[in-house]
Amino acid sequence: MRVREMQRNWQHLGRWGLLFLGILIICSAADKLWVTVYYGVPVWKEATTTLFCASDAKAYEREVHNVWATYACVPTDPSPQELVLGNVSEKFNMWKNNMVDQMHEDIISLWDESLKPCVKLTPLCVTLNCTKAIINVTSSNNTTLAPNVTISEEMKNCSFNITTEIRDKQKKEYALFYKLDVVQINNSNTSYRLINCNTSTLTQACPKVSFDPIPIHYCAPAGFAILKCNNKTFNGTGLCRNVSTVQCTHGIKPVVSTQLLLNGSLAEEKMIIRSENISDNTKTIIVQFKNPVKINCTRPNNNTRRSIHIGPGRAFYATGEIIGDTRKAHCNISEKQWYDTLIKIATEFKDQYNKTVGFQPSAGGDLEITTHSFNCRGEFFYCNTTILFNHTRVNDILSNNHTRENDTITLPCRIKQIVNMWQRVGQAMYAPPIAGKIQCNSNITGLLLTIDGGEGNESETLRPGGGDMRDNWRSELYKYKVVKIEPLGVAPTKAKRQVVQREKRAVGMGAMFLGFLGAAGSTMGAASITLTVQARNLLSGIVQQQSNLLKAIEAQQHLLQLTVWGIKQLQARILAVERYLKDQQLLGIWGCSGKLICPTTVPWNLSWSNKSQDEIWGNMTWMEWEKEIGNYTDTIYRLIESAQNQQEKNEQDLLALDKWDNLWNWFSITRWLWYIEIFIMIIGSLIGLRIVFTVLSIINRVRQGYSPLSLQTLIPNSRGPERPGGIEEEGGEQDKDRSIRLVSGFLALAWDDFRSLCVFSYHCLRNFILIAARTVDKGLKRGWEVLKYLWNLAQYWGQELKNSAISLLDRTAIAVAEGTDRIIEILQRAGRAVLNIPRRIRQGLERALL
């Protein structure tokens, strides 16, 4: 009976076991994805950061007093790297570019910084007694191209009282001033003052300061990169499909000018017109030439410079006298080159915007806006450009046949020494006169224009503009943007981290801030293969950059304070280290230090992205993937951190068990030797105890006078009185007697004990399994009965609800029908009553007549 019951139980248990095994196989067939961390992925985001400068200042000028202070920049890379990003498109917007604002602030700061140690000319705010300047004229052999106005009509000879080295004494001095720098007092023809005295303080530029522009390369710190658009016809906004990454921009000359852009970069294929809104007359239009137009500017007269002491330790440098050629300063431009350029501008406007354009001079404003202002060898020129733009229509240019090769357009120029730079109120600069003849040759590479505007006009008028120096820098930085590199990426894979296992951590390496972007256009699968290459040189790149910046900072230690560039270099150093430490901190928190690919125990949630693994790794780039899961990145990071915290807690709990941290260690050779040692000790203890008890038993029986039988003698096991030894049939034949075998030897004794222990363990285990199987079977049967009961109950209540609903509908239908019948009956009665009215009237009349 027991065997049959056991077989039945095992049949039920086998059936349920097969069912659970099938469910397990089905569940395991679906691949579960886990979050995996990747370090060194080619992903970036738009950002603003502190840029630093690189320049070859020593190659341009040995004098260290250049106003742009580029000697404080790091040296340029002799072989700059430019990495083309294949299969990458990026949006650019030159009108909202932080690089432009940053360069503008840098140039202003450098300008102000160069004037800090210079002399303040506050003592010159006194009454000036001025007369017309008398110039010693020396005839010139060639005056055909010079303006008719001489320099004597542009200058005033002024005398004034000034404090000497001894404060309580004054002396009378004289100096030549330009008419633009002085204004009359109370409309007097002889009393004048400097133009700035009622509005701003005046600082004289230091005598050794040079204003010649030196190319400045803006560079991104480690952890950031500069993206460059290489489309030859890029208009400054929109999507660029030819993108590369560079460490530094090209050399940008900080030329401060209005109307005409000087010595900038040229367009490669054709002239480019750029505007944020071409129909808005408040927006500046930037025109970039393909071919430059040469402009040669000259101050012919030969000045002498004299020093006037205006107090202890302070000197004012003024123009002493003018010797030689007294022609006015002027600029010469090739007539053919200029008019060819205007025709090309009109053609481009016709092609791009379907508008016919003409050119007119500036509509008015400050002198810096209405003229072409620029600096030439330390003197500030203001040139009248009316002759360049005085053309109502381009047809006028063509009809006048301005095609002669040797014809020259001469622009009359005026010079100012008191300059209010950057259109700021409250601060002005006095530029000391430059001795000798001044001449500078430049290339016009672009124009700053404004449009008169108007709705529905097919013809437009263009005028020269400028004044906001941001447009000057924007004309060079239009193709750049700064991005922040995000080397940490997460993606789903089938790999899961092996939890609670101790191992040595490798030394971490980084990803070079420029080189690893080379895989940006590749699919995620292809990029992940090259993670080692992409991530190898970040730390070394940072160290190299830090070394270069440190050398540049050390070069300024002789100064009392750092320049603008020095501060930026310190900021770049700190920022680079912070970026690297931040990434390494996250990797450490996640338990991924020193790993390029780091599986985790966080399951991938399909709500983050329900794309298949093949679709993700085979078709998407890392940039596309980052945009896909960008909203969930913080959530994933928190889950990884929580999982790592739990993992570390589990490791701590497991390590508390000392050597039980790894199951496989139980099968090592040293463990087996330890197991054998324990086994021998247990067997020896059992044998020793058996010997002790046997000896004690023999001694006890000897003391009682009893001699033991042979150890090989089998002693019959006496049966109880209730069980006789014979059987009833065949004369009481005896049954087989049971006997107890007395073993001989200690090994036989140990084996007998061990066998008895195994038999006992087997019986106990078998009984336990049978009880467990029977319990499980009964539980499953009870559960099945409960489910069937619940199902029957649900069916019963469903049927009841159905019957109730049908009954309710029937009653409702009956009530509606009865109500409808009553309404119809009432209407019929009312109708019959109305129809019977004439009959009742007739009957009433008949009765009345009778």
UniProtKB/Swiss-Prot annotation:
Region (CD4-binding loop): 362-372
Region (MPER): 656-677
Annotated site residue numbers, Cleavage: 505-506
GO BP annotation list: clathrin-dependent endocytosis of virus by host cell; fusion of virus membrane with host endosome membrane; fusion of virus membrane with host plasma membrane; positive regulation of plasma membrane raft polarization; positive regulation of receptor clustering; viral protein processing; virion attachment to host cell
Extracellular side: 32-678
Keywords: AIDS, Apoptosis, Clathrin-mediated endocytosis of virus by host, Cleavage on pair of basic residues, Coiled coil, Disulfide bond, Fusion of virus membrane with host endosomal membrane, Fusion of virus membrane with host membrane, Glycoprotein, Host cell membrane, Host endosome, Host membrane, Host-virus interaction, Lipoprotein, Membrane, Palmitate, Signal, Transmembrane, Transmembrane helix, Viral attachment to host cell, Viral envelope protein, Viral immunoevasion, Viral penetration into host cytoplasm, Virion, Virus endocytosis by host, Virus entry into host cell
Motif position, Di-leucine internalization motif: 849-850
Cystine residue pairs: 53-73, 118-206, 125-197, 130-158, 219-248, 229-240, 297-331, 376-440, 383-413, 592-598
Region (Immunosuppression): 568-586
Protein name as annotated: Envelope glycoprotein gp160
Glycan-modified residues: 87, 129, 136, 141-142, 148, 157, 161, 186, 189, 198, 231, 235, 242, 263, 277, 296, 302, 332, 354, 384, 390, 401, 406, 443, 457, 605, 610, 619, 631
Signal peptide coordinates: 1-31
Pfam families, per database record: GP120, GP41
More info: Inhibitors targeting HIV-1 viral envelope proteins are used as antiretroviral drugs. Attachment of virions to the cell surface via non-specific interactions and CD4 binding can be blocked by inhibitors that include cyanovirin-N, cyclotriazadisulfonamide analogs, PRO 2000, TNX 355 and PRO 542. In addition, BMS 806 can block CD4-induced conformational changes. Env interactions with the coreceptor molecules can be targeted by CCR5 antagonists including SCH-D, maraviroc (UK 427857) and aplaviroc (GW 873140), and the CXCR4 antagonist AMD 070. HIV-1 lineages are divided in three main groups, M (for Major), O (for Outlier), and N (for New, or Non-M, Non-O). The vast majority of strains found worldwide belong to the group M. Group O seems to be endemic to and largely confined to Cameroon and neighboring countries in West Central Africa, where these viruses represent a small minority of HIV-1 strains. The group N is represented by a limited number of isolates from Cameroonian persons. The group M is further subdivided in 9 clades or subtypes (A to D, F to H, J and K).
GO CC term (a single one): viral envelope
Gene3D superfamilies to which the protein is assigned, alphabetical: 1.10.287.210, Human immunodeficiency virus 1, Gp160, envelope glycoprotein, Single helix bin
Superkingdom of this protein's organism: Viruses
Family: Belongs to the HIV-1 env protein family.
V2, as annotated region: 158-197
Region of interest called Disordered, as start-end residue ranges on this chain: 716-736
Ranges in the topological domain labelled Cytoplasmic: 700-850
